[in-house]
Amino acid sequence: VKFGMPAGYSAATLGWGYYEFKDAYDSLGQTAHLKEITNRFSKYFKDCTTLSGDTVTNFCYQIGQGGGGNDHGYWGPAETQEAIKGKRTAYWTSNGASDIAAAYSAALAVNYINFGNAEDLKYAKALYDFSVKYNKSENETTSPYYNSYDYYDDQAWAAGWLYLATGDSSYKTFLDTFMNSSGQGMSGQSGCQWGVYSPMNWNNVSMGAAILQAEITKSASDWAKVTTYLDSKATSESQYYCEDTWGSARHNVAVQMTALITSKYKKESGKDYSSWAKAQMGMILGDNSTGKNLVVGFNENSPKYPHHRSASGHAYDPTDEGTPKWDAENGHVLVGALVGGPTGTDFSTYNDSITDAVSNEVALDYNAGLVGAAAGLYTTYKTGSLESSIPGVGATPTTTAATTTTTGKTTTTAAVTTTKAAETTKAPTTVAQGDGCYTKKVNQDVVYKELPAADK
């Protein structure tokens, strides 16, 4: 399933991390890899959008269905999902999904700022105009997942990036209004008149909008709306910050990232949360009462059973997700994925089980915050290095890496793209004998049944 809301959030958050901590990516040789990822997101968002001149006529906000007996009801790699192959519904709208249109807009705008693709800015402006024209939240789908509460915060987030990209004062005016509103939007969603009220996440990007506003104005009162919230969260360097039982680590790293950005501007914000963020990241990476860390493939104490279909290597069972026998270790190592984490402040509540989506699910939006926080910490402390012993880390970025998995037995890596070929003429597959790696040009088919056994 391609869910528009978390995709837009993840792409914009990745781009934001680069925007704030560019030197960290550059000094570690990660800029090309980051650009490859955000450009791929941006291409997808543009491909999902139909323009007539500079006006959006309609756009696709979701592909596939998350519920019932569709994608979410199937366990196994997408390549073997023959029953649904070619039959997924694409959800388009000509007058709604303002939240997702704004999320796409923000991601495209920040990618334009970072890397200068004029087409990204063109689509970002058009999607923003579409969003504020209709002021209507996500259209109805059969999916019960990632339903957004509102669109006002997403529009303000996009407006902030568009102002930075263009200098057009109309975007700044919209952001100003959001920052001083107490009740607007579809269901009376509050702006930030009384300050930030939620951690940065796919369903509420008010924190991001507020930080952009404070960066632009350099106003002590605008920064206070950010720091008052962060002060209430960054309270202990010895206790794990748990915002919510489900996917607590995702919220932890998102607050780390926003706290580190705020610390970057400490002359204006008056706050430095760097030490708190470093302590929290230490807990996530194993400095806790159990010694377990929450990043797959990081070391021997990493999660072994993340809730991820392709990485599991397990075959489909017609019964529901909770009943198959998941006694075998995952067939592939999903290197770098952040799992959900403890359900409380005590790490003993973390459960490394493939059937536990609360503690062990992985997601794009989880990792987006992790990457930004890591870049912020490296910028601040200038310590650490690329861990070359982890397969795939430190390698020259390729143009095809849509998914990277590592087989549990051979520790070989395989970058797989499952996108439909744009042309009928295909570049030959090259296989490096003995290491299980192969390469493909962008948008070329990978035929699952023809792959070497180790790569499957």
Language-model segments: which ranges?
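Long, well-ordered core segments of solenoidal/helical folds
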Residues: 37-53, 122-139, 166-196, 219-240, ...
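Extracellular mucin-like PTS domains
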Residues: 397-430
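Secreted, propeptide-processed cysteine-rich mini-domains
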Residues: 434-449
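N-terminal structural segment of carbohydrate-active enzymes
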Residues: 1-43
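Active-site acid/base region of carbohydrate-active enzymes
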Residues: 36-83, 117-122, 126-128, 135-147
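Structural signature of Gram-negative outer-membrane beta-barrels, strongest in the C-terminal barrel
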Residues: 136-148, 153-157, 164, 178-181
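Aromatic (Trp/Tyr) and acidic
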Residues: 1-17, 61-111, 152-170, 174-177, ...
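Short, flexible helix-adjacent loops and helix caps
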Residues: 19-26, 50, 113-116, 136-143, ...
